[in-house]
């Protein structure tokens, strides 16, 4: 049934997307500033519905990957390696020095804490998707670090009791006969040099002995669309740990001095766009933070750590390329450095400017001089998606109609590749139908929504409670499953819970399993029975329908729902 459901949903939604595309509504860009009301909302939904809904082109993946990587390397090669702020015009030099002074104040109490944070993603040595850090620690090939990052990474492991133990045990296993003499020699060497922490000195050598030294970042890609891939880099494992640790310290300085907390600032930006301030969008921002400019902009106490933790070489297809940018996505501190850099520039034109990565919000009168200034420093402003005037604003994936003072609900409709994705896609369309009042886009979505009802089983029908998009229920107001009666015990116990327990009864068809081996079974099943001494529960070919009672909100069976609140 899963394959049939998948094919049906793909066909139904594909037809709807093509109908929406035929309307010829403008794509997301400068024209949106002139739209308002239902016309604006329809154009936004149409853009997001059509831009990403396409069957994955597997045949062209190699060519697309090569083209994307070459474009990335060309961008890197075009960045300047020499920067002197004295070459800037006087007004621009004043803004640059103001940004440097602002950063010096924000980072005045920056001190590395060497805290540990779990890295994610592939390392410089690929593990084919096995990115769990505990898994990496069990593999010799994943113990990688650049030579300059060894002291920083070793300090992180030294200050974490569990990592410290792992390193010591690994060192003992690698040098079972000499580890004690080697560690004692390093410790005595530190004592002779009167170092502050001889134990750390000895541990650093032990840590380096456990690792392979890798001085490059591996270039790879992740799918974006059928025209272009997103290029990222894969770092040595312990470089990733050190980069994330440094990023957390930078975030803490930013939070203490400005009140901007990266952890939840995306949600703040989604609210700030309703103020009507200008929103500035950049193209390829993470790849245009020039390293020579960063060295002149940030305090030396930060730059010296950046120098040690970033790799100065890219590796791709056996060739090596110097890194002229700070670091692309894939490096642990790229996003935080991007936020600090652009925020420092924006604050020179608007003291109330805000930044989250490359999403900038500032006053309308400050937008033009800000964009002119950053373009002189190598940044590329996406003018088609930058909104200074008009009724439309966009930031961090949120869209606002200033004329009606409301956020516009919209979704990216993506090609489903499994049954769970079908449910999510269907629920997106369900919510879009409810949020639109009228218009040709709504008419198309309504027809699509009605056809989807025949695709999903009625037992999956459920009311939309306004929560997350569900991947096992289809949101509809039609009756599907029957409401199950609650026993007296459930009613009493659920009264002590934070919410009342509502039950729904759904039918499920399953094969009836036999409990005994028959004489007419084949030889393979008989051999299995003789070896095991019991039946494997071989299906008899008959199907039996059973009713399963589940919690209406969570989908859990009643036995899995805690009915008593300890609070």
Where are these regions (language model features)?
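Conserved polymerase palm-domain catalytic core
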Residues: 248, 273-356, 361-380, 384-400, ...
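A short, surface-exposed helix-loop junction/capping segment
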Residues: 223-230, 319-325
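Flexible linker/loop signature enriched in Pro/Ser/Thr and Pro/Gly
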Residues: 263-270, 312, 555, 560-565
């Amino acid at each position: 049934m899963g394959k049939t459901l998948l094919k049906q949903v793909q066909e139904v939604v594909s037809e709807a997307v093509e109908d929406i595309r035929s309307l010829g509504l403008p794509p997301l860009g400068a024209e949106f500033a002139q739209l308002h009301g239902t016309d604006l909302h329809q154009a936004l939904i149409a853009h997001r519905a059509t831009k990403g809904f396409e069957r994955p082109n597997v045949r062209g993946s190699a060519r697309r990957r090569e083209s994307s990587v070459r474009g990335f390397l060309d961008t890197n090669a075009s960045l300047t390696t020499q920067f002197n702020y004295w070459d800037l015009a006087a007004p621009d030099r004043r803004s640059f020095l103001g940004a440097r002074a602002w950063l010096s104040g924000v980072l005045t109490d920056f001190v590395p804490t060497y805290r540990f944070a779990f890295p994610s993603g592939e390392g410089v040595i690929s593990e084919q998707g096995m990115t769990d850090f505990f898994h990496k620690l069990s593999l010799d090939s994943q113990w990688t670090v650049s030579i300059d990052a060894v002291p920083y990474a070793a300090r992180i492991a030294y200050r974490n009791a569990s990592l410290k133990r792992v390193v010591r045990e690994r060192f003992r296993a690698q040098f079972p006969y000499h580890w004690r003499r080697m560690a004692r020699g390093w410790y005595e060497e530190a004592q002779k040099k009167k170092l502050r922490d001889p134990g750390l000195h000895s541990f650093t050598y032990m840590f380096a002995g456990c690792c392979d030294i890798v001085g490059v970042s591996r270039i790879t890609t992740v799918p974006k669309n059928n025209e272009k891939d997103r290029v990222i880099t894969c770092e040595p494992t312990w470089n990733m740990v050190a980069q994330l640790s440094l990023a957390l310290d930078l975030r803490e300085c930013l939070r203490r001095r400005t009140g901007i907390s990266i952890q939840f600032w995306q949600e703040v930006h989604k609210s700030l766009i309703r103020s009507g301030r200008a929103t500035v969008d950049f193209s390829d921002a993470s790849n245009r933070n020039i390293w020579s400019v960063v060295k002149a902009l940030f305090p030396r106490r930060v730059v010296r750590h950046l120098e040690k933790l970033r790799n100065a070489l890219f590796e791709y297809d056996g060739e090596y390329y110097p890194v002229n940018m700070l670091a692309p996505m894939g490096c642990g501190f790229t996003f935080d450095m991007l936020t600090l850099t652009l925020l420092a520039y924006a604050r020179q034109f608007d003291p109330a400017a805000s930044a989250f990565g490359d999403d900038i919000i500032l006053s309308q009168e400050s937008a033009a001089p800000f964009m002119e200034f950053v373009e002189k420093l190598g940044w590329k402003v996406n003018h088609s998606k930058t909104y200074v005037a008009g009724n439309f604003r966009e930031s961090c994936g949120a869209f606002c109609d200033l004329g009606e003072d409301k956020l516009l609900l919209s979704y990216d409709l993506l090609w489903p590749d499994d049954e769970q994705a079908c449910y999510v896609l269907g629920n997106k369309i369900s919510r879009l139908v409810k949020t639109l009042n009228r218009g040709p886009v709504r008419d198309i979505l309504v027809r699509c929504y009605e056809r989807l009802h025949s695709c999903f089983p009625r037992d999956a029908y459920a009311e939309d409670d306004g929560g997350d998009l569900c991947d096992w229920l289809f949101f509809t107001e039609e009756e599907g499953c029957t409401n199950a009666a609650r026993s007296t015990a459930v009613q009493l116990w659920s009264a002590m819970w934070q919410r009342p327990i509502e039950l729904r009864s759904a039918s499920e068809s399953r094969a009836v399993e036999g409990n005994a081996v028959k004489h007419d079974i084949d030889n393979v099943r008989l051999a299995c029975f003789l070896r095991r001494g019991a039946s494997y529960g071989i299906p008899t070919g008959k199907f039996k329908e059973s009713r399963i009672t589940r919690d209406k909100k969570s989908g859990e069976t009643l036995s899995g729902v805690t009915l008593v609140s300890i609070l």
